């Protein structure tokens, strides 16, 4: 759902190593993880392993998160926290 996608994008906005693409126009949020030193596939795999969060690897460094009506606000916050935590831990 578009509102949750916008919220997710906002939550990731100041995450070190992560760049959110401008213009969330649908229920998808695209973001780049190159600044974390990880590829999108590695980042995806760690999100699944560490937090059970499934976000697609769309390109070498580009991720695609898709929201829908069955994902709660708390779920969006949990996913954003997992992305932020992983990005920060990899920068240390």
What role is predicted for each listed range?
Residues 1-8:
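Structural signature of PLP-dependent enzymes
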Residues 28, 53-54:
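Structural motif
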Residues 38, 45, 49-50, 57-92:
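PLP-dependent enzyme catalytic core of the Aspartate aminotransferase-like
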Residues 2, 17-47, 69-71:
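Conserved PLP-binding catalytic core of the aspartate aminotransferase-like
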Residues 15-24, 56-59, 91-92:
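Flexible, glycine/charged-enriched surface loops at secondary-structure junctions
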């Amino acid at each position: 759902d578009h509102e949750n996608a916008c919220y997710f994008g906002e939550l990731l906005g100041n995450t070190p190593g992560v760049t959110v693409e401008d213009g969330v126009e649908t229920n998808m949020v695209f973001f780049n993880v190159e600044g974390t030193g990880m590829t999108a596939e590695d980042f995806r795999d760690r999100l699944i392993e560490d937090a059970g969060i499934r976000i697609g690897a769309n390109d070498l460094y580009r991720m695609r998160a898709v929201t829908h009506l069955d994902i709660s606000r708390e779920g969006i916050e949990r996913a954003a926290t997992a992305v932020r935590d992983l990005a920060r831990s990899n920068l240390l």
